Amino acid sequence: MTAALPPSLDGLRVLDFSRLLPGPYCTWLLADQGAEVIRVENPRELAKQAKVFGWDKMDAEDQARQRGRDMLARGKKSLRLDLGDSDAQAVLKRLVARVDVVVEDYRPGVLAGLGLSYEDLSALNPALVYVSLTLCGQTGPLRDKPGHDPVALALSGVMSRTGEDPEAPGLPGTPAADVLTGSHAAFATLAAVMSARATGLGRHVDVAMTECAMTLTANLLSRYETPADAPPRGSRRADLGLWRCADGRWLCTTDMEPRYWATFCEVMGRPDFIPLQLDASRRDEIRETLQALFAEKPRAHWLALFAEAGTQFAPVNDVTEALAEEQFRTRGAVVDVTLPGGTRQPQLGPPVRLGGEPAPRPAALPGHDNAEILERLGLEQEEITALSG
């Protein structure tokens, strides 16, 4: 009988100062693989968030449920401390000596002003991996520039390639740069941890949203001599697309390989289109013809035909439909988490399968783990109470 695998990152200790999406996404990936992530939550930041999202008007029970829905805080411990308080800063420095990784997403220089820079903390723990996530990185003329996901997509050139309108840039409906940055940061964190464990020396990991977003242009840069040679964006291929069916529902096809394109054309009753796959002069005509055909039957009709033929296709699911997909449920990509009060809510499971992932634990309220963490440092109850506010 095979022994159960332990969580892949069991024993990795992370102190998480991050607040915006890229940092918490990075540490969520680590926590979901078993890392102990201690989320440092500043009362001032919490108050700002509560006001912006209206959480300050909720009663305690609703606040607990709302917090439990925060997927990116799932599986993390919460340490509520005022970063501006000198006693809290001293406690954090003691904690730094016991962790492997620090993650932060403040603008360059902010944590240095609190005595929590890489230089300050690596002096206490030479093997420390200190991960900084910012818009443009720790160096360069734009190092101090503020901005969120759309600014990163705009600066990186990605927005110029987004959307169906070739005359105007487009905004994606999801925070692509944020999530991509968090993923890159998680990879970089583990690379630096491997090095630290081999050498005993940590490092400052500098993650820029703009540079992570630029990786979305890798395919374009690999295919054309200059970016200007790339065709305009939008529906410029006949062999892939989004199609509206008779019932108003959408499906997607990606039959770019010749054998798939041939099968697709046969299914659509237009074998004459097979030799015209790459004929740019006929693409608009082919697309118009295909769209008219799709508009004759409901989506279920086309899904059944394509499934039988084995072509490349998918229904365009909304988020609710995606959460209910049997494929995702079977693999644990969607899990049900019990929130405070007993409500069950579907959330995303770990996006990769390593085996041994711990069961999902809903996000705890801010400060939930203060006593456990501070007692571990040897603080007395009076000190814990004073620091916890």
What residue ranges belong to the model's regions?
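N-terminal helix-loop segment corresponding to the beta1-alpha1 unit
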Residues: 1-201, 225, 365, 370-389
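Terminal low-complexity tails and localization/encapsulation signals of metabolic enzymes
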Residues: 1-13, 241-246, 321-389
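Short, well-structured beta-strand/strand-turn elements
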Residues: 37-40, 307-321, 380-385
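Glycine-rich beta-alpha junction loops
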Residues: 44, 135-137, 209-214, 247-249, ...
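Aromatic-enriched alpha-helical interface/lid elements that frame and gate functional surfaces
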Residues: 94, 234, 238-309, 313
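A short glycine-threonine-serine/GTX helix/turn-capping micro-motif
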Residues: 169-180, 202-204, 231-234, 238-240, ...
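Substrate-binding/catalytic subdomain of NAD(P)-dependent oxidoreductase enzymes
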Residues: 193-227
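Short linear loop/turn motifs
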Residues: 275-288, 317-324, 382-389
